[in-house]
UniProtKB/Swiss-Prot annotation:
It comes from Schizosaccharomyces pombe (strain 972 / ATCC 24843) (Fission yeast). GO terms for biological process: cytoplasmic translation; methylation. Belongs to the methyltransferase superfamily. NTM1 family. The gene is tae1. This is Alpha N-terminal protein methyltransferase 1. It is found in: Cytoplasm. GO terms for cellular component: cytoplasm; cytosol. It catalyses: N-terminal L-alanyl-L-prolyl-L-lysyl-[protein] + 3 S-adenosyl-L-methionine = N-terminal N,N,N-trimethyl-L-alanyl-L-prolyl-L-lysyl-[protein] + 3 S-adenosyl-L-homocysteine + 3 H(+); N-terminal L-seryl-L-prolyl-L-lysyl-[protein] + 3 S-adenosyl-L-methionine = N-terminal N,N,N-trimethyl-L-seryl-L-prolyl-L-lysyl-[protein] + 3 S-adenosyl-L-homocysteine + 3 H(+); N-terminal L-prolyl-L-prolyl-L-lysyl-[protein] + 2 S-adenosyl-L-methionine = N-terminal N,N-dimethyl-L-prolyl-L-prolyl-L-lysyl-[protein] + 2 S-adenosyl-L-homocysteine + 2 H(+).
Amino acid sequence: MDPEKFYSDAIDYWNGVQPTVDGMLGGLGTGRIPQTDVVGSRTFLNRLNYRIGKIENLVAADCGAGIGRVTENVLLKIASHVDLVEPVENFISTAKKQLATKPCSFINVGLQNWTPEKNRYGLIWNQWCLSHLTDEDLIAYLSRCCEAIQEKGVICVKENVSSFEDTFDPIDSSVTRCEQSLKSLFKKANLVVVAETLQHGFPEELFPVKMYALVPHSS
């Protein structure tokens, strides 16, 4: 796989997607899926309150933030400030307009090129974006996240998971990884899984979606 083409093809694809909830969710944004997704994420974060609930003035990062759907409906419910990290200019511009009155900052960069500030975050949320990183860049990115979270901080991953083997999609230039691959990459980034769960309520024809809470091995 040519990394440069892998990344440029993904940006080309997303540049052609409308900056709407329906666009962010691949045409599934008008039914029950958006709310089901939000409820699942909030419920998962409630399980982590024993860690992140102890952090005053929690700052969160919404990685692969799109138009800010997760920031608005999930992260701002628990965070005093959210940094939205998103490589697609049209999406980040839309997010700025929709969240203009909210305590948010906007970072227009791909995760493979983002170096988060050390010890800034109580929560780094990654949803439907890590499939757009190569294995090497994913390990490096998660390693940087390790240094960016505070003592009680958590890195969360919410991604599609394939059943048997990693699956490349040439349409949006993404790799849906199997659980074994994901956990191997987490381990290589010196992260351990402290909580995980399956997202319920999504159509059976879609890939299963899993949530993982990760902390540095020494935590």
